[in-house]
């Protein structure tokens, strides 16, 4: 990706919303080809296209374990929202279960170097005339990322090692909001802020686990850390190629098992 080194004046020309912090702005890196997208809207529309192609989704259903057969995985044990248990069988199995991948892989004796790293986001509803940034802003000193999504501004940041606790710490979210207001002091939210917390599936080297397992029909697409949305489409294409027995078109040093 192209990146340009800009001084403070050039940063303000690209993003006028930074004028509120111009006295402390030294400069920045600008990636003109960088883009921002709404992951929820994308996946909802993608699910609709998948249904049209014949895909069946089992929502509110948990995979509790995988069953190993003579020639690989023979079934996945599942439990739905009513507590009803069953099995799903297929020719190939793809594990894309984020931070829970390591525990699920252990049911087959597989070891994945994935651990949950907790992060938070704050989403602000914006008025039509809000002085919000039009480009994505990353502030390394404040350790936050700001993205303008339609009529909302989302600010994300922090990294906590709290196991699988995904509860929202309001104090952490309030701190993220304060840091964003230091950069954009003129933003007036059009409503209440929405606080959220999630678990990032991190690997020691920040490289995702993509490829075939030691079982011929089990494949991995997990461990993307903070870059799940960024790498989603490319990773999906790569693992689809691997499952089909093709060499991935995307050259990337995926973690090999």
Which residue ranges define each predicted feature?
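Dinucleotide-binding Rossmann-like beta1-alpha1 core, especially the glycine-rich loop
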Residues: 1-9, 179-181
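Short, conserved active-site loop motifs that form the nucleotide-linked donor/cofactor pocket
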Residues: 54-56, 153, 218
